[in-house]
Amino acid sequence: MEIKSIKKLKLYGFNNLTKTLSFNMYDICYAKTPEHRKAYIEYIDEEYNSERLTNILIEVANIIGANILNIAKQDYDPQGASVTMLISEGKVEQDVENGQGNGNAIGSATDCDNGDGKAGEDCALLIPNAVAAHLDKSHITVHTYPESHPDKGISTFRADIDVSTCGMISPLKALNYLINSFSSDIVIADYRVRGFTRDVSGKKYFIDHKINSIQNYIAKETRELYQMIDVNVYQDNIFHTKMLLKEFDLDNYLFGTAKKELLPGEKKKIKQRLKKEMYEIFSGRNIPKV
């Protein structure tokens, strides 16, 4: 979706506005036995390992038109993964042979693709000046948190994503791609704009585009799938949207067990547990037993 600017601004110097889009994405399931819970954690840990997360972030950089400076990734034991990517708005000139450059960028996002959709070795390249330069650059990060409860049979997977940019590039362009990449049951999205930029007359601008809700930038077909609630603080350029998947098919939430294998009473109890878990995460508070 097009990011509509307030009006055409002639800026004095660099656009110093920092725009940050943050997600907490949740996948919920019911795993009946300890073996099923262990298998779910192993499955989700492999499904969203650091390599796949890296490829998702490379595509995000492509979508928003950013250049990749550096990628750091890590898979954790016993579970979880993290990827951090430093990006910049413009291509940073470098001289690899002499080790010179003003930031030493790897290059555009496409430079990190081997041609098979996977991140190449050059994405791990960190030329000396890059670390010192990153404070005035933008970044994309993702961290995953698989977990399960031994008594209730509920297992959850959470992915935290931050896309922070400065300059003219906007993280909102990657909004729909990120939502679709994780196919989550619950999405908590935050968008904020910080700092200011000036026009040539010296007037400060604290935001440079039109927005009254994150929902403005979510595709119609996605909006139709989710129940959504907004909490926005317009005067502070803070926008918050919660999303809960409308459709509930028990089969989609069972891991290692089919719905037909359960007794009617079991189905009802499991459905109640799952819905309670989802509403608690969606609302951000525990729901007492009635």
UniProtKB/Swiss-Prot annotation:
Specify the taxonomic lineage: Bacteria, Bacillati, Bacillota, Clostridia, Eubacteriales
Any idea which GO molecular function terms this record carries? adenosylmethionine decarboxylase activity
How this chain assembles, per its entry, is: Heterooctamer of four alpha and four beta chains arranged as a tetramer of alpha/beta heterodimers.
Task: Tell me how the cofactor is bound.
Answer: Binds 1 pyruvoyl group covalently per subunit.
Which cofactor is essential here? pyruvate
Q: Where is this site: Cleavage (non-hydrolytic)?
A: K137, S138
Q: Does the keyword Lyase apply?
A: yes
Where along the chain is the active site annotated? S138 (schiff-base intermediate with substrate), H143 (proton acceptor), C166 (proton donor)
Under catalytic activity, the entry for this protein gives:
S-adenosyl-L-methionine + H(+) = S-adenosyl 3-(methylsulfanyl)propylamine + CO2
Q: What does this protein do?
A: Catalyzes the decarboxylation of S-adenosylmethionine to S-adenosylmethioninamine (dcAdoMet), the propylamine donor required for the synthesis of the polyamines spermine and spermidine from the diamine putrescine.
What name appears for this protein in its UniProt entry? Answer: S-adenosylmethionine decarboxylase proenzyme
Organism (species): Heliobacterium modesticaldum (strain ATCC 51547 / Ice1)
* Pathway(s) it belongs to: Amine and polyamine biosynthesis; S-adenosylmethioninamine biosynthesis; S-adenosylmethioninamine from S-adenosyl-L-methionine: step 1/1
Where on the tree of life does the source sit, at the highest rank? Bacteria
Task: State the UniProt keywords alphabetically.
Answer: Autocatalytic cleavage, Decarboxylase, Lyase, Polyamine biosynthesis, Pyruvate, S-adenosyl-L-methionine, Schiff base, Spermidine biosynthesis, Zymogen
